[in-house]
Swiss-Prot record:
Residues that hold substrate according to the record: 319, 388-393, 589, 664-667
Taxonomic path: Eukaryota, Metazoa, Chordata, Craniata, Vertebrata
Entry keywords, A to Z: Disease variant, Hydrolase, Metal-binding, Nucleotide metabolism, Phosphoprotein, Zinc
Protein name listed in UniProt: AMP deaminase 3
Family according to the record: Belongs to the metallo-dependent hydrolases superfamily. Adenosine and AMP deaminases family.
Database matches in NCBIfam families: AMP_deaminase
Matching PROSITE patterns: A_DEAMINASE
Pathway where this protein functions: Purine metabolism; IMP biosynthesis via salvage pathway; IMP from AMP: step 1/1
Gene name for this UniProt entry: AMPD3
InterPro entries: A/AMP_deam_AS, AMPD, Metal_Hydrolase
Cofactor(s) it depends on: Zn(2+)
Amino acid sequence: MPRQFPKLNISEVDEQVRLLAEKVFAKVLREEDSKDALSLFTVPEDCPIGQKEAKERELQKELAEQKSVETAKRKKSFKMIRSQSLSLQMPPQQDWKGPPAASPAMSPTTPVVTGATSLPTPAPYAMPEFQRVTISGDYCAGITLEDYEQAAKSLAKALMIREKYARLAYHRFPRITSQYLGHPRADTAPPEEGLPDFHPPPLPQEDPYCLDDAPPNLDYLVHMQGGILFVYDNKKMLEHQEPHSLPYPDLETYTVDMSHILALITDGPTKTYCHRRLNFLESKFSLHEMLNEMSEFKELKSNPHRDFYNVRKVDTHIHAAACMNQKHLLRFIKHTYQTEPDRTVAEKRGRKITLRQVFDGLHMDPYDLTVDSLDVHAGRQTFHRFDKFNSKYNPVGASELRDLYLKTENYLGGEYFARMVKEVARELEESKYQYSEPRLSIYGRSPEEWPNLAYWFIQHKVYSPNMRWIIQVPRIYDIFRSKKLLPNFGKMLENIFLPLFKATINPQDHRELHLFLKYVTGFDSVDDESKHSDHMFSDKSPNPDVWTSEQNPPYSYYLYYMYANIMVLNNLRRERGLSTFLFRPHCGEAGSITHLVSAFLTADNISHGLLLKKSPVLQYLYYLAQIPIAMSPLSNNSLFLEYSKNPLREFLHKGLHVSLSTDDPMQFHYTKEALMEEYAIAAQVWKLSTCDLCEIARNSVLQSGLSHQEKQKFLGQNYYKEGPEGNDIRKTNVAQIRMAFRYETLCNELSFLSDAMKSEEITALTN
């Protein structure tokens, strides 16, 4: 059956939900001050009057419930369901026999979903004994039954919306969450079905630059409508507007779904419920750590050959133009000046310029340069000044040196930049255990950017087994429009995505781009999130082909149209047996909380995510959906948030899927191994244990664009399975106790949602 995008109508949205969503957007647009704009979504930390009034309201609700016969019946039915859930989540304890022996009874329990015909078989994995924390009672949320059921059902609906968008774009969605939501294929589909398709690395005897394996051309036609590229089998189909059978997104449906999430994050009972659950998760981890820290440490000590230094780590968020540290850049500049000062490196007004003349024009001698005079490091002056931070990409404040050393398109064809990237790659290969995912820019000014970038990659032989590439699209349409480089926003989207569709449909005609795309694993959306936009994105927003103003579209507008085209492209590439792409935008570093709502629907994973701390509902949803978050505390420390206030440790303890990344080593780091610098500082400041560090490292590999074969090699054959069954301690150095705790805790939280849905069914049957 062909995959289709399920459409909804705006009239199907509850009027109250729609008005609330519009109120949220209007609030964000009206108030530039971030604290005021976030007031709708935050739970006040210190407001005695507000807390007292809230407690009074809760008490009145509790007293009213005690007198209600109907509520008593519902409580009784829910108590039965909850008792069953708790008994299933607590496997019996036995002596640990060690990793080689299988003991099914010791495995964390797989969920029993509504409508399941039989109990799922527990994972055949041995588990060491450890101390568990459980809470029993009528309902464990600490709020009234009515509020609990309302919150749980709303959260379940939000997760179902997320699952719909993830599956349509071949993004990842946790199988365990899908099981609890009652997805019909969750029990029958093979565990590896939901994995993204990344091209495996070439074998040692294979040429990574071979152009002869392109599949045959299909000669489909591609036409943009409303900012989205549609594929047609032939000219006749195009004339009749009958596109190829692929899922094409619908803006009205997206607006409906976004309205539900926006209304949810402002709902009082849901905010209270999520706030309590998040506090519980953090407290539960503290208790787990207190009770089982030594048991975890004993597990790691008995694990031969593996420690923190020789587990694989991936830098999941790093920009190629700043992937080297400042000393590396300085050394390279001096080396090129000493070895080839008379080489022609630029052309200005028809006059060729040598490297010596470039520095003479800047009135400087490279011999006298220091890391301080190079001035590429971010400091105190860049805090909350993204404009000053961007200027740090210009060595010595000279854009000429940036164009010469840090660009792929210049007189030398990006040779110097390629050489530096290859030096960084060589250091990664020597370290053996470190990988990175550098971002390369595509601006959308011209469709020639793609073939030029592919040529740069092949011409300078930039491939490295320790690197996977991500394409970042800066949100700077307003700059190009003001310079008359683009007629409308639709043209920018066409320049970004049309070459990819052509290379997918007719790879024989675009061999270089087809080859380059094998090593590209995702797309990123980048720029200063704190920029204010006066436009409220909705189904009434102008189409990209009529967005001709010099005003930049809002963040949500960018994300929807990038996701829409990536979704269609992924389905086309999957049909052809080619690799697919993940959407991994910068999100939640600054700006509006609505950015995180857009990413919840459209992104596979995000970078930064700091603003999740401001919204308990979104933070809890990101936890339940296990959305990967690449965090860069040293980068944030120089730009938006002091290191001590960074929520990474808090997110890790609660169980969010976080990894450590460097962002821009040139601006923020001092050592040659920037990623190890991140881990070392985090470990010292937050007193992270070895198990914590290895868990973060394992998360980074899971989040990354490394292929299925590589992840099996680095994490274990069953890495895609959830819980201890998917963990091979011999490769990850993550204690099975920790994996069991994470899995059982997630199952427990998800069971609250499924129990609420079951209680509704039982109540309906008894009435």
